[in-house]
Amino acid sequence: MNSVGEECTDMKREYDQCFNRWFAEKFLKGDGSGDPCTELFRRYRECVQKAIKDKDIPVDGVDFMGPSKSKTEADGSS
């Protein structure tokens, strides 16, 4: 799947490969220490945020789940 911004697609693929490799080779084998893909994700996220802004895609009112939100907090249920 391509990214929302064409200029971000290569970064997305690079991050996806990094994450999938880390998940399969480390995390699933019990090594949850560190995520070597953090910097790739940060750069990809910045690219996507810029693309959303440049394309004037409205995101107001959209709830995003982040590391500090559980699904029930994000969707308003308990």
Swiss-Prot record:
Keywords: Apoptosis, Coiled coil, Developmental protein, Disulfide bond, Lipid transport, Mitochondrion, Transport
Signal peptide start and end residues: none
Compartments reported by the entry: Mitochondrion; Mitochondrion intermembrane space
Motif annotated as Cx9C motif 1, chain positions: 8-18
Assigned GO CC terms: cytosol; mitochondrial intermembrane space; mitochondrion; nucleus
Molecular function as annotated in GO: phosphatidic acid transfer activity
GO BP terms: apoptotic process; negative regulation of intrinsic apoptotic signaling pathway in response to DNA damage by p53 class mediator; phospholipid translocation; phospholipid transport; pronephros development
Catalytic reaction equation(s): a 1,2-diacyl-sn-glycero-3-phosphate(in) = a 1,2-diacyl-sn-glycero-3-phosphate(out)
Annotated ranges, domain CHCH: 5-55
InterPro entries to which the protein is assigned, alphabetical: MDM35_apoptosis
Assembly, per entry: Monomer. Forms a complex with prelid1 in the mitochondrion intermembrane space. Interacts with prelid3a.
Family the UniProt entry places it in: Belongs to the TRIAP1/MDM35 family.
Designated name of the protein: TP53-regulated inhibitor of apoptosis 1-B
Organism: Xenopus laevis (African clawed frog)
